[in-house]
Amino acid sequence: MNAQTLSQSGSTTISNSDNKKWAIVGGGMLGLTLAMRMAKQGHDVTLIEAAPVLGGLASVWNLGDIVWDRHYHVTLLSDSRLRNLISELGLEDKMKWVETKTGFYTDGKFYSMSDTKEFLSFPPLNLIEKLRLGGTIFYASKIKNWKRLEKITVEKWLRRWSGNSVFEKIWEPLLKCKLGEAYRKTAASFIWAHTSRMYKARRTGLKKEMFGYVEGGYRTIIESMEQELKSLGVTIKTGCPTSKVEKGSDGQFTVEYANEESADKFDRVIMTTPNAILERVCTDLSAQEKQKFSNVNYLGIVCASLLLKKPLSVYYVTNLTDDWVPMTAVIEMTTIVDPKELGGNSLVYLPKYIPAEHEMFDKTDDEVKESFLAALERMYPDFTRDDVLAFEISRVRNVMAIPTLRYSESLPEMNTSVDGLYIVNSSYILKGNLNVNESITIAEDALDTVLKTELQAT
């Protein structure tokens, strides 16, 4: 029998007096957080990751002579769950905060949009359009009942509040850049989530954009979490892609691996993988559950990392509204990260968000590289290919679930029809867009749901 207690935060905890063995499949930030929280309650946890290293979308790789994040990440002042985790890991003194600038590239020109004065002087919009755009952002940041925004498309909502001209000049190009044609079926809750997070980040001081990072990037955070897990007795299996999770007549789950003949037995399993994987792997799920997971549309990403001899611009993010540009944005990471950590060089990310079935996933690295570099040459007259010290491309087909109309109503329960099998992945992010802070939030909040279900079963 499990004993129930109440943690200081008010969440449910149960002791592991019956010695249940838990498997957490997926070693990204969500899985890492779940494993750490459960292990701290005394549970017997095994963390299983398909890749050779932990971290998922927050993992690191070699870029020339440096080791840095495979995808771009930034911490906002309002990212309370992530900041609490960083503090818990003893890394708070390694946290660096920097004031940043935001740029727009539209009609072949760059504009700064980093403060109120620059916003009011933004040439592509007249005064009325600026007021409507600013009013839309402010109004979105104040909305509390986000569920009502699930009932209207983002296009209809933005046209209503910003007007047709602002939508067509600003919002539509940005939505197409981020979502492709999927923006047409995306709920207004998407823009609310993005706007409210960014607005919170500017609520301190003089409304400045203060973004942060931990020295060493996510390598520092993930290595600290891995050390913490090992000290808590967590078994970590990397390089083990899960091929099947099946419950036997003895009530235990057998977890099979694609690259091993052996299998492991567990009493409980939590899947943190994208829906496409769990549909294939979890054979005991009902047809209705599989259909609900299948109905979730995902965006993927093709993201280039460039190590350059010199920076491209002074903007952390340059939003792109010209439809000829093949990237979603230009991320100048060295506006935040000290160049000393990058060998005195500049780090730039060029992401392109696309549907999982997009043809860009089938292009060769050379084709993607040529497309991106040609765009940079056109956008930045001072840029030359001789500036490129390293160029690497990451491709992930299932990154972010698209919040379609009435999205929260369409998701299946985390506690599935299979007793002891739980689904806790990023498709359950409802009050925000995909980022590390939201992944940690889902992990910590979902744990309460999982443990309450376990208590009810005892």
Where on the chain are the PLM-derived regions?
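Internal hydrophobic alpha-helix adjacent to the cofactor/substrate pocket in enzyme cavities
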Residues: 439-458
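Active-site/ligand-binding neighborhood in enzyme catalytic cores
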Residues: 17, 135-248, 265
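Extreme N-terminal leader/targeting segments of oxidoreductases
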Residues: 1-22, 40-41
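N-terminal Rossmann-like FAD-binding beta1-loop-alpha1 element of flavoenzymes
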Residues: 20-47
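Mid-domain catalytic core of redox enzymes
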Residues: 2, 41, 241-348, 353-362, ...
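Short FAD-binding loop at a beta-strand-to-alpha-helix junction that anchors the flavin cofactor
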Residues: 348-349, 414-432, 438, 442
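Dinucleotide-binding Rossmann-like beta1-alpha1 core, especially the glycine-rich loop
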Residues: 64-146, 173
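Glycine-rich FAD pyrophosphate-binding loop
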Residues: 39-63
